[in-house]
Amino acid sequence: MKWKHVPFLVMISLLSLSPNHLFLAQLIPDPEDVERGNDHGTPIPTSDNDDNSLGYTGSRLRQEDFPPRIVEHPSDLIVSKGEPATLNCKAEGRPTPTIEWYKGGERVETDKDDPRSHRMLLPSGSLFFLRIVHGRKSRPDEGVYVCVARNYLGEAVSHNASLEVAILRDDFRQNPSDVMVAVGEPAVMECQPPRGHPEPTISWKKDGSPLDDKDERITIRGGKLMITYTRKSDAGKYVCVGTNMVGERESEVAELTVLERPSFVKRPSNLAVTVDDSAEFKCEARGDPVPTVRWRKDDGELPKSRYEIRDDHTLKIRKVTAGDMGSYTCVAENMVGKAEASATLTVQEPPHFVVKPRDQVVALGRTVTFQCEATGNPQPAIFWRREGSQNLLFSYQPPQSSSRFSVSQTGDLTITNVQRSDVGYYICQTLNVAGSIITKAYLEVTDVIADRPPPVIRQGPVNQTVAVDGTFVLSCVATGSPVPTILWRKDGVLVSTQDSRIKQLENGVLQIRYAKLGDTGRYTCIASTPSGEATWSAYIEVQEFGVPVQPPRPTDPNLIPSAPSKPEVTDVSRNTVTLSWQPNLNSGATPTSYIIEAFSHASGSSWQTVAENVKTETSAIKGLKPNAIYLFLVRAANAYGISDPSQISDPVKTQDVLPTSQGVDHKQVQRELGNAVLHLHNPTVLSSSSIEVHWTVDQQSQYIQGYKILYRPSGANHGESDWLVFEVRTPAKNSVVIPDLRKGVNYEIKARPFFNEFQGADSEIKFAKTLEEAPSAPPQGVTVSKNDGNGTAILVSWQPPPEDTQNGMVQEYKVWCLGNETRYHINKTVDGSTFSVVIPFLVPGIRYSVEVAASTGAGSGVKSEPQFIQLDAHGNPVSPEDQVSLAQQISDVVKQPAFIAGIGAACWIILMVFSIWLYRHRKKRNGLTSTYAGIRKVPSFTFTPTVTYQRGGEAVSSGGRPGLLNISEPAAQPWLADTWPNTGNNHNDCSISCCTAGNGNSDSNLTTYSRPADCIANYNNQLDNKQTNLMLPESTVYGDVDLSNKINEMKTFNSPNLKDGRFVNPSGQPTPYATTQLIQSNLSNNMNNGSGDSGEKHWKPLGQQKQEVAPVQYNIVEQNKLNKDYRANDTVPPTIPYNQSYDQNTGGSYNSSDRGSSTSGSQGHKKGARTPKVPKQGGMNWADLLPPPPAHPPPHSNSEEYNISVDESYDQEMPCPVPPARMYLQQDELEEEEDERGPTPPVRGAASSPAAVSYSHQSTATLTPSPQEELQPMLQDCPEETGHMQHQPDRRRQPVSPPPPPRPISPPHTYGYISGPLVSDMDTDAPEEEEDEADMEVAKMQTRRLLLRGLEQTPASSVGDLESSVTGSMINGWGSASEEDNISSGRSSVSSSDGSFFTDADFAQAVAAAAEYAGLKVARRQMQDAAGRRHFHASQCPRPTSPVSTDSNMSAAVMQKTRPAKKLKHQPGHLRRETYTDDLPPPPVPPPAIKSPTAQSKTQLEVRPVVVPKLPSMDARTDRSSDRKGSSYKGREVLDGRQVVDMRTNPGDPREAQEQQNDGKGRGNKAAKRDLPPAKTHLIQEDILPYCRPTFPTSNNPRDPSSSSSMSSRGSGSRQREQANVGRRNIAEMQVLGGYERGEDNNEELEETES
C-alpha cells in the first residue's frame, strides 16, 4: 500500500520546485489513498521547512501534519433582504487548511475572486454577506451552503447550512372585520397574517396598545381573538399584527362594538292617586345604543289626549279617572334586546253620594227613614250623627233594642216612633282614603191630621158627545181618609139633583137622561175630605137630531196602562224637587207619557197638575215654593186613557233661603268654621310657574263660603316674606292651580276656609318647588383683565344674574374664551358660587372674545356680551383700536364666501360681456367679408336699391333694403345685400334730392341704385376668369327716382295719399317714379301745386285710358296703402316709391323690384343693423357702347317726369320724397285701411292683405329674382301715369343732358345690376376714401362689366335654359321680407345654380348683347293722347339699352325672332310662361312676399310673362288655386299672354282690353278662359318666377290693378314675347311717345326689328 504512493511522491518531488504545482498536487490527491491513510492513522511525513506550505520537502511528510477538520459547522440562517449575514465555518488541520464555500455544488465567488462581490471570505473561514440580494427573478444568495476545508492531506466538508431570505408581505390574507356584540356575549375576531417566511406570528393591539392576553377572558389561537365574556370596556379598535424577522405588518382596523342591553336605572313604581289628579310613572333606562322607551297599558290603550311622555320618558296622565286604573308597562328596547318594567295605577275616588237624605215630615209616632248612599274607591264608610251630638251611628254596629235609631248596611238611617224631640238635622258622612263628604237632612214632626193628604180621584169623567134625549153617565171614583165626599158642578155651578133627568148614584156617578141642548158644558167632580179636595173635569156636548153621534167606546182595562210606582224624591232645592219612578210593565199597556200631580198646604187644598206629557221616568218639578212640604203622585197615560194614580210620595220639604240672607249668628258661624278641618295634599308642580293644590274638608259646613290658598317663597334667601293669597269662592271645589309663580323657587303653601269676614283654621303647610329654566339674563359686570401672576393669563370676573331672572339655582358658570380659530378656543366651568376665573396660556397676538353664561339644572342661560382682549408679545393687553390690523380686516373680508362669490360672478359677467363683444365683432367682420365675397359665392341677381337722404344735415341711408348709394357722402354707405340698415322712423325734412338738373348735374344726395348687373359682375369673380371689360354707362337713363318711396317701400302698402286707390300728393297730383337710377327729365311743374283732385274717387274707363299716354316707369311694390300711411301730414311733399309707378286708373302703384319691396315692413327686421362701408370703384365709360340720350324729349308735358332741372332740384314745390314719419304699419292697421279702401291691386310677391303686404327686413342676399319679372310691370304703369299727367299742361320736359364723364362702377355689394347714374352722378365724384377703396376692385370689375349684358338674358342662357337659370341662380338672390317670405329666403338659399346662365356661351351672348344694345333700332309706335295728339309715351321713347337700366325692354333680344306663342294651362304653383329671356337684364326686384317652402328645381319653375290686366270673365281658378296654396302673393296671372282688364278699373269695356291682348299676342283667346274676378289673388308659394320683360301698355290697354307687382313677374309667355319685342327699342330713335296698337302691327314691327 505504501508503494502505491510512490508514483505520487515522485510526482510531488518533481513538482517541488513550483509551489503552484505543489498546490495543484495537493488538490489532486487520490481520495481513496488519503482516506485510507487517515483511517490507518499513518502520518504523512512533512518537511520541517515552515515555508513549505504543504509540509513536506522533497518526498518526506512531516509527522505533525494532519488533514483538515471542521471545528465549527455553519448553521442555517434566515436573513432579511438587504441585511448582512454571516455563515460561520472553522476548520483546523496542519498545515492550516484553506476554506472554500459551495452553494448547490457550485463554488461561491467571493471578494477574493471578484473585488466587487458582496460576499467576503473572512480569515476565519466564515462567509460574510455585505447584504443579502434577493429579488423576484434573481435570488443569488439563497440556497444551501457547505464549507470545504482543504490541505494537502485532504479536505473536510461541513454540514449543509441553508441561507433563506426572510419574507413578509404587506397584505393580510384575512383582515379582521368589525364585530358588534352585547355585553356578556362572546366576541370573535379572525385574522390571517400575510404570507411570509418564516411564518409570521400574530398578536393583537387594542386602541394602539398591545392587547393584554393575560386576561382569562381573552384567548388568541390560530389568528383568532376570542373574548368569552365581553364587557363594555372591551369596546375599541383592534388591529391584528403579523410579525417575523422582517418586521411587523398591521391589518386594517376592526372595531369591536359592545352593545348594552337595555336596563332600567329607574323603574316605575305603583301609584295611587285620586280622581282628577295627575299620575306620573318614571322610567329611566340605559343601554348602548340608547334604547327607545315606550309605554303601554296592559289591559287597554293609554287614555287619549290625557297622557304625555316627557323627554325623560316619564309617563304623565292628567285628570285621572276610575277607568285609568290598571297596569302600565315601560318598554325599553334597542337593537340588542328589550326590557320591561310595570307598575300599577290605583285611582282613589273620593266618595260621592248616590242618594242623599232629604228632609222629612212625619207625624208623631210614625217611622221615618233617611236614605244615604255613597260610592268611591275604595268603598267609603257611611255613618250618621245628629247635629250637635257626638254620638256616631255606623252601619256595622249591632242594633240596640232600646234604641230607636239604626243604620242599615246600605247606610240608611231609620227612626222609629218619632217623637217631637227628634226634630232637627241629621248628618250623613261618608269617608275613604281619598276624602270624606257630609250631607244632612231635616226631620219635622207634625200632627196626625196635618199629615193626611187630600183625597185622590182614581177615575174621573171623560169627554162625551150625546144626542138630544140621550143619556150620558159621568163616573168619579175617589179615595181618601176619611172617604171623600163627591160633588158635581157644571160650568162652576153645583149640579142640582132635583131635576128628574139628573141622578147621582151612591158611588158618586152622575147620570143625566133625556139630554138637552142646555146640558152641554163642563162637568167637574169634586172629592173632598177635611185635609183637602180633588177635582176632575170633563166636557159634555149635546147635539140635535140628525147629527150622527158616535157612542163612547167601551174601555178595555188591558189597553189602559197600570199605575206607576211610588215616586221617589232624588233631589230637593229651594224651588225644585226631582222625582223618579218606574212604570208597571207587569200589567196593562205600555204608557206613552206621564202626568205628575202635587199637593202642598202652602199652595192650596187640592191636587194640582204640575207636569204633563212627561216622556221619561224622571222629572224635575220647578216653580215650587221654598220651605214648603209637597206630596207628589204620578199617572201613566196612553191613547186609550189614564191609569190609576201611583202611591203618594213621601212628604218633601223644599229648602229654605240661604242663611246669609236671613242674618247669621256670628258665634254659630265661627263655631262651624272652626269645626271644618282642611287636609292639604302634597302640591303638584305643573310647570315652572304653576302649582296645583288639592285639599279635603273633614267637617263640611254650610257656612263655608270658600277657601283661601296662602303661599310664599321659602328658603334662606327669601326669609319670612308675606303670604300671598289666592281665593277660591266655590265651596264645592277642592283643588286649584296657583299661577304666575317664580321659576325654580321653593314655596310653602297652606289653605284656610272663610265665610264673609270670618275665617277658619289653617291647614298644614306643604312645600313645592317650581321647575327650573335656563337663566333668562346673562351674568352682570363681566370684566376681562390681565392676570398679574402669569404673563399669558387673563382674569375674568362677573356678578350673578338678577335674582328674578335666574330661574332656579345657579349651579355653575360657563366661560368661553374664543380665539379667531378653533385651536385657540379655551373653555372653563366653575361652580355657582364662584364669580371669577383665571384663563392661562393665551397666545399672544390672537384676539380673544370672552363670554360668560350662568347655568341651572335646566341648562345654560343667556351669554354675556363678548369682551375682547388681545395680548402682545410681552403679555400686555393691546388697545382696542390696535387689535385688528388692516391686513387682518382685509384677510377677513377676502375669506368671506360672499366676497369670493362676488369676485366669481364679476369675472363671469366680464367674460360674458367680452364673449358677446367678440361675437358681435366677429359677426360684423364676417358680415363685411360676406358683403364683398359672399355675393360672389351665391349666384343671385338681386336688385338692392337703397335710398340715401339727409337728416339733420348729414347723409343717412334709408331704412330700406340695400342698394342705394350716395357716392358723394362717405357716411351714407350703401346697404349691403346681407345686412339691414337701421330704419329711421321720422324723416320730416325734405332733404332728398330726387330731381336732376337739366345740365346733367345732380345734388350730392342724389340716390344711386345698385342693380343686379353689379351682382352679376361680382359673382363672376368666382367664375373661370371670364372677365370682360364692362364699361359703366354714363347716361341714357330717363326715369325719375323718387327717393322717399324707397322708404315707403320699407313700410306696408298703406299710404295716406292713396285716395280711392290712387296715389296723389296733397294737391291731388300723382307723383312719378322709376325703378332704376334714371336720368330724370326736368319736372317743371310743381308737384305740390298740381291740379289733381285728391278727393277724386273713380276708375277711369278704358276709352279714356286709350287716349292717355302711359309713361314708362318701373314699379316695385304696390304702395297705394303704404304711401297713404306716411303721408298723413298734408304738408309733407308727396312721394311714391322710387321703383313704383302710379296707376292712374287703379290708383295703385306697382312694384317691380323685390329688392325694394322686400325691404319694407317691420316683421323680421333686425333693427340697428349697420351697413358696412363698401369701396367705390371706378367704372368704365359706356358712352362708346351706348347711344346718347335723345336731344329733344317727346313733346308732352308728362316728360317732365323724367327730367328735373337743377333749379327745381330743391324747389319746395317739387315733389321731393320725404322719409316716412312712420315706417311701418301694423298688421291691424293695414287690414283696416284695406277694408276702407276696398279692393286694392295686389302686389307681386306680396299678399293684398296687410299681413302679406307688410314686409319684414330679412336678408335677401340669397334670393334671386327672375330676370324679366321685374321690368315689364314697371313699364306697364305708364298708361295711368300718362293719363293723369294730361291734367298738368304747364309741366314741361327738358331734354336730357349729354352723357357725363365716366363714373365709378357700382360697388360690389349690388346684385346683378350696375347702378345707372343720374345726371348729377355724371359730375359728382365719389369721395377719395371710397375711390381708394374702389381702386382695389377696379381691375377685376372692368373685366367683368362687359359680361353683364351677356349674363342678363341671352338666347342661350335665358331661352335655352330659362327655367334652370331662373331657378338656379337668379331666384337665389330674390328676397321677400314679409312674414310669409321667410320660406322664400330658405328656398333661395338652397336653390341650385346648376341652371345658371353663367356659361361660356352666355358670356359670348352677353358681349353680343352689349353690342346689340349699342346700335339697336326699334320701330316706334305713336299713340294719341286725350287731345288727339300722337306722341310717344315716356316709357316707350327710344333710348339706349344701357346695362345700367333695369328696364328689361331695352334688351339685346329685340333683334331676335319672336317665338310663336304657346297656350299654357294655368296650374297653381306651376305657372308656365314662355318668353324671350335671352336679351333682358335681370330685373331689379323679386316678388316681395313670395313664400315658397321649397326651392323649385329648374324643371319645376317656368318662365312666366308679365301679368297684364285680365278680362272680368277670366276663369278665377288661378285665384282659388293660389289661395288654396296659402300664398301671401296676390295677383292675377296672364295665361298665354292674354291681358286682363280690371273690372274695377274699367268695368265697362272689357272687350277692348281683350282685343288689345289678343292683338298684342297675335292670337286671340277666348275671354271666358281668362276672365278673373278683380279680387286679389295669392300666388302659390312655389311660384318664384324668373324675369319677364316689362311691356309698354298703351292707354287702350291699362294695367289691371291686380297686376301691380304680379305683372312684373307673372304673365303668359306670349304676352311677354309681344311686349319684349315691342319694348326693345333704341331710345335714341324714340322721339315721341309711342304706344302699342292692336292688330298684327305688333308682330310686323317686331319682325322688322328682328330683321
Curated annotation (Swiss-Prot):
Widely expressed, with exception of kidney. PROSITE patterns: FN3, IG_LIKE. Residues 919-1651 are cytoplasmic. The chain crosses the membrane at residues 898-918. Changing V273A: In NORS; uncertain significance. GO terms for molecular function: axon guidance receptor activity; identical protein binding; LRR domain binding. Changing P564S: In CPHD8; uncertain significance. InterPro entries: FN3_dom, FN3_sf, Ig-like_dom, Ig-like_dom_sf, Ig-like_fold, Ig_I-set, Ig_sub, Ig_sub2. Disulfide bonds join C89-C147, C191-C240, C283-C330, C372-C428, C476-C525. Residues 1281-1293, 1516-1541, 1549-1573 have a biased composition (Basic and acidic residues). The modification Phosphoserine is found at S940, S1055, S1297. GO terms for biological process: aorta development; aortic valve morphogenesis; axon midline choice point recognition; cell adhesion; cell migration involved in sprouting angiogenesis; chemorepulsion involved in postnatal olfactory bulb interneuron migration; endocardial cushion formation; heart induction. Residues 68-164, 170-257, 262-346, 351-446, 455-541 form the Ig-like C2-type domain. Residues 1322-1336, 1642-1651 have a biased composition (Acidic residues). It comes from the Eukaryota. The keyword Glycoprotein applies. Residues 563-657, 676-773, 778-874 form the Fibronectin type-III domain. Residues 1-25 form the signal peptide. Receptor for SLIT1 and SLIT2 that mediates cellular responses to molecular guidance cues in cellular migration, including axonal navigation at the ventral midline of the neural tube and projection of axons to different regions during neuronal development. Interaction with the intracellular domain of FLRT3 mediates axon attraction towards cells expressing NTN1. In axon growth cones, the silencing of the attractive effect of NTN1 by SLIT2 may require the formation of a ROBO1-DCC complex. This is Roundabout homolog 1. It comes from Homo sapiens.
